[in-house]
């Protein structure tokens, strides 16, 4: 199991395809599996790998809570497609040009002609299969918790500020006020986003910019549509 080399373009493509129908590396909530792969990736994937980028931005929003996420962090070879070997950090690509792609992680310095032919054939089949997939617009449903400073905050004005945020690929949905204690209520608001256009980081940055009303914003739920 694995994703190949997550520091390479080929490895990120494997991760992107793996996440095409998944919100998380394992299960239905963020876990230590996501943290292990997130740390191995190390930087946001390219914009054209929108499944991987959507996942990366979502897991990044759990930076402060990552130690408390469920599960046990395992080796990268314990995650991902069963037919791909993990080679991240193995040094297999250190002596190669960045353009060299080793999707299936050969350990031999000198590949036989037959092994090279088979590897290139499998890579071509992989690229062909991916190219035939229809270009779908990936969307996610996000539930946000927006917390005010205190019980005197004008929550109607706070919601008005949040809904004033407009972006291509962002649609606001229903909302409600939820008591959190000491007379304070938080705004819980639903939105649907196009993953390659709107991320949780962007939403947090713009919502918390209304600092007269907003103390913080958290992602309460994130589901791929």
From Swiss-Prot:
Provide the residue span(s) of the region labelled Disordered: 80-114
Q: Does the keyword Ion transport apply?
A: no
Name the source organism.
Gallus gallus (Chicken)
Q: Which Pfam families match?
A: EF-1_beta_acid, EF1_GNE
Name of the protein this chain belongs to: Elongation factor 1-beta
Task: Please describe what this protein does.
Answer: Catalytic subunit of the guanine nucleotide exchange factor (GEF) (eEF1B subcomplex) of the eukaryotic elongation factor 1 complex (eEF1). Stimulates the exchange of GDP for GTP on elongation factor 1A (eEF1A), probably by displacing GDP from the nucleotide binding pocket in eEF1A.
Q: What's an example GO cellular component term for this entry?
A: cytosol
- Key words of the record: Elongation factor, Phosphoprotein, Protein biosynthesis
């Amino acid at each position: 199991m694995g994703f190949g080399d997550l520091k390479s373009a080929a490895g990120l493509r494997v991760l992107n395809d793996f996440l095409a129908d998944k919100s998380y590396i394992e299960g239905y909530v963020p876990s230590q599996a996501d943290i292990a792969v997130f740390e191995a990736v190390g930087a946001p994937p390219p914009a054209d790998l929108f499944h991987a980028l959507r996942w990366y931005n979502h897991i990044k929003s759990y930076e402060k809570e990552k130690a408390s996420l469920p599960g046990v962090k395992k080796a990268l070879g314990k995650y991902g497609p069963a037919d791909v070997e993990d080679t991240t950090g193995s040094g297999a690509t250190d002596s190669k040009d960045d353009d060299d792609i080793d999707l299936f992680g050969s350990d031999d310095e000198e590949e036989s002609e037959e092994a090279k032919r088979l590897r290139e054939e499998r890579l071509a089949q992989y690229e062909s299969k991916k190219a035939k997939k229809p270009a779908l617009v990936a969307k996610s449903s996000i539930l946000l918790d927006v917390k005010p400073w205190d019980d005197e905050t004008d929550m109607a004005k706070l919601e008005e500020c949040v809904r004033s945020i407009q972006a291509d690929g962002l649609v606001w949905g229903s909302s409600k006020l939820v008591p959190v204690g000491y007379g304070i209520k938080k705004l819980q608001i639903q939105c649907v986003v196009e993953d390659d256009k709107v991320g949780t980081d962007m939403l947090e940055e713009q919502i918390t910019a209304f600092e007269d009303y907003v103390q913080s914003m958290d992602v309460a739920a994130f589901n791929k549509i």
